[in-house]
A protein has these predicted regions:
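Terminal amphipathic helices with adjacent charged low-complexity linkers/tails
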Residues: 15-24
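Short acidic/histidine-centered micro-motifs embedded in hydrophobic/aromatic stretches
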Residues: 4, 21, 47
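Short linear sequence elements within intrinsically disordered, low-complexity coil regions
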Residues: 6-9, 23, 68
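Non-catalytic interaction/clamp surfaces of large macromolecular machines
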Residues: 1-16
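Short beta-alpha connecting loops at secondary-structure transitions
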Residues: 170-174
Length: 182
């Protein structure tokens, strides 16, 4: 994942600020680790960290060989994850997000809000960008009031969340079909 971050010119400091990490290619590395910590498999399922293989009936990690983006709540507590595939040949799905859980509803959260909130309030403006890497790049270059929706659309719930901090919003989505759709 370091090569990918280097290609995108993301510094180590920025990667640490956003608590970026990576998952191994193993099928059940996280599952085995959490088992040693006495975490119940049902809790792992409920939190979207593992799933049950339809082929084998065994627990498998949801995120394998991915650059990991921890998703924080308004206070910065990690409530979910987004993962970007590192090896394009290992999965057709470029991005994979945690499912909705008792702690996380993607339509009610904004990526990076816990890091951007003070700046948003200070400048009385937020900038909505398209995705994880857009937020990270903005922050790296001093645009610390950038946030992103967690999905393909900006929802009314996300709007209400943002309006607790400012009513001034700029939108900067990509010019591709996904950005236009969002």
């Amino acid at each position: 994942y370091r090569d990918y971050l280097q290609q995108r010119q993301i510094t180590r400091e920025t990667a640490e600020k956003f608590r970026l990490g990576a998952t191994p290619n193993g099928w059940d590395s996280l599952y085995q680790f959490l088992k040693t910590k006495k975490i119940n498999p049902q809790e792992m399922l409920d939190l979207g960290l593992v799933s049950v293989s339809q082929k084998t009936g065994r627990y498998v990690d949801r995120f394998r060989q991915r650059l990991m983006f921890p998703i924080g709540d308004e206070k910065g507590n990690i409530i979910a994850f987004g993962g970007r595939i590192i090896d394009k040949e290992s999965s057709p799905q470029k991005y994979l997000n945690s499912p909705d859980t008792p702690l996380f509803h993607k339509s009610r959260n904004l990526y990076g809000l816990h890091l951007a909130r003070n700046k948003i309030r200070n400048v009385d403006q937020a900038i909505i960008v398209e995705g994880y890497m857009d937020v990270i790049s903005c922050h790296q270059y001093g645009i610390n009031n950038a946030v992103a929706p967690l999905g393909t659309a900006f929802t009314p719930e996300q709007g209400k969340l943002l309006m607790r901090n400012t009513y001034q919003v700029g939108i900067s989505f990509d010019g591709d079909s996904a950005g236009v759709k969002a």
